[in-house]
């Protein structure tokens, strides 16, 4: 079988580079593809044409582009689409994504369906995120609202830059709205997961979206840095250090760990068994890899029983072949990462304060080392001191700390929380939760942290990121 060669894409035109990087199978080391490599100079040179990307998209109305998104969703899910010097079926897409990322096939398919769902429902999503604003106002830059008020929105950038991760194909839903908003895309794919951006690009093109609105720059780290430097608005995905680095930079939206949590209120905690399925799903879904997975369950009592019940459910889970429909955990493909995380957890254990409850249900070690990859088996900690560092930590596998903490101290102790599910009917506490600025997405009721409604903003509203609301007048105001 010949190895697929995948070019750099410069405003829709393939570009072959002398520098190439191999993308290999995580278990066998077999070369799956050769990626032509961009460099920072190339990105800098192409940035001068960024305004043309928006011009190309503005040939079509937002409504027409939403329809093209719907068509692209179907093509992405079902069609054989071009990939470099070959083509790729949906089955081949899932297979190669699994082979290079270590993600089980069932999770690759689930992520594929999630991306397609967002594309299919793009009209509803944009209607919700714009609060019903007529989309032609975004295209034209100004217009009359239904209440007969002149409003103006100015695009903050002609293109959205993305520095994408290698280990989480689910994040691609966040940049898909750019195209129907007539904003071009400058994508730096993850080194082992270029498959989603390239397939999405081909699906958009097959649906009639102008190719010249998109750049794809596989390459080393300096390419990502240059994308962030040259684009007026960008997103980057990484760890806490990445989030800290770009904190306060209005040009960059940094997505990092979620520290998502379930908080059990005193009014309902005695019925914790009723919510066990919600807790388990929140921890284990998608291999526990996402910022939307639950990494902390907080309650004032019953925490030892809760931790034990979750540990019984997820502790026995073992690594399975990626093709097994029951596979529930993903491989760590970068040497040393899993071992370092496992050592860190062990170092955090403290008799009577931090206990690994899964140890007795695991029947083996947490760390499973294989020839070319490692696995971490699900881990549940019971933490009796809410100030201990292990009460608020997160790892890229099914890991959760069940923390004992009085309800009246929870909001001051949980720290930054991307998704907070509060299982309570206490109206006074619900008001406090609504007011808590350290919770981004708030769920009230037994809703898994990973059950996202895409009609809601995620880590900020992309409309507010890509457009600036400003004053506009083309006639004298009343009373002048």
Language-model-derived ranges and their functions:
Residues 13-15, 39, 166-167, 191-192, ...:
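Short, glycine-/Ser/Thr-/acidic-enriched flexible segments
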Residues 45, 49, 60-71, 199, ...:
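A non-catalytic, amphipathic alpha-helix used as a structural packing/dimerization or gating element
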Residues 215-218, 255-256, 321-331, 425, ...:
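A generic structural motif
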Residues 25-35, 62-77, 189, 209-211, ...:
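Conserved C-terminal structural/oligomerization subdomain of aldehyde/semialdehyde dehydrogenase
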Residues 131-280, 457-459:
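Rossmann-like NAD(P) dinucleotide-binding subdomain of oxidoreductase/dehydrogenase enzymes
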Residues 1-146:
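N-terminal Rossmann-like NAD(P)+-binding subdomain of aldehyde/semialdehyde dehydrogenases
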Residues 13-18, 155-156, 168-171, 373-375:
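Short, flexible loop/turn motifs enriched in small residues
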Residues 203-206, 231-233, 239-385:
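ALDH superfamily catalytic-core signature
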């Amino acid at each position: 079988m010949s190895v697929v060669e995948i070019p750099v894409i410069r405003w829709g035109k393939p570009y072959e580079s002398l520098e190439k990087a191999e993308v290999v199978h995580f278990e066998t080391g077999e070369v799956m593809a050769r990626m032509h490599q961009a460099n920072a100079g190339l990105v800098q040179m192409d940035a001068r044409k960024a305004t043309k990307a928006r011009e190309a998209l503005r040939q079509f109305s937002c409504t027409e582009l939403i329809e093209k998104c719907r068509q692209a969703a179907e093509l992405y899910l079902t069609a054989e689409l071009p990939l470099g010097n070959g083509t790729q079926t949906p089955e081949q897409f899932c297979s190669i994504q699994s082979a290079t990322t270590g993600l089980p096939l069932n999770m690759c398919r689930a992520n594929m369906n999630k991306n397609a769902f967002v594309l299919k429902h793009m009209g509803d999503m944009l209607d919700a995120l714009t609060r019903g604003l007529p989309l032609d106002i975004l295209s034209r830059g100004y217009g009359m609202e239904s209440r007969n008020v002149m409003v103006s929105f100015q695009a903050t950038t002609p293109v959205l830059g993305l520095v994408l991760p290698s280990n989480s194909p689910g994040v691609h839903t966040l940049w898909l709205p750019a195209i129907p908003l007539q904003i071009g895309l400058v994508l730096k794919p993850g080194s082992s997961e270029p498959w989603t951006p390239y397939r999405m690009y081909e699906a958009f093109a097959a649906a009639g979206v102008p190719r010249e609105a998109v750049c794809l720059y596989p390459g080393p780290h300096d390419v990502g840095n240059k994308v962030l430097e040259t684009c007026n608005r960008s997103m980057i995905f990484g760890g806490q250090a990445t989030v800290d680095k770009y904190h306060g930079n209005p040009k960059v939206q940094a997505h990092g760990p979620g520290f998502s949590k379930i908080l059990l209120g005193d009014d309902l905690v005695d019925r914790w068994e009723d919510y066990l399925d919600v807790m388990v799903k929140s921890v284990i879904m998608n291999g526990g890899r996402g910022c939307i997975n639950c990494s902390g369950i907080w309650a004032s009592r019953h925490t030892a029983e809760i931790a034990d019940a979750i540990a019984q459910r997820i502790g026995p889970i073992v690594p399975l072949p990626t093709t097994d429909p029951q596979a529930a955990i993903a491989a760590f493909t970068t040497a040393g990462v899993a071992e370092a995380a496992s050592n860190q957890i062990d170092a955090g254990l403290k008799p009577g304060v931090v206990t690994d409850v899964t140890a007795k249900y695991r029947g083996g070690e947490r760390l499973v080392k294989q020839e070319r990859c490692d696995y971490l088996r699900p881990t549940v900690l019971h933490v009796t001191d809410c100030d201990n560092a292990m009460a608020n930590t997160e790892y890229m596998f099914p890991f959760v700390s069940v923390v004992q903490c009085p309800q009246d101290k929870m909001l001051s102790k949980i720290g930054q929380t991307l998704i907070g599910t509060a299982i309570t009917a206490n109206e006074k506490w619900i008001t406090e939760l609504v007011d808590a600025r350290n919770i981004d997405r708030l769920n009230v009721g037994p809703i898994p942290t990973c059950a996202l409604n895409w009609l809601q903003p995620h880590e900020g509203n992309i409309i507010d990121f890509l457009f600036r609301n400003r004053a506009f007048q083309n006639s004298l105001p009343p009373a002048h």
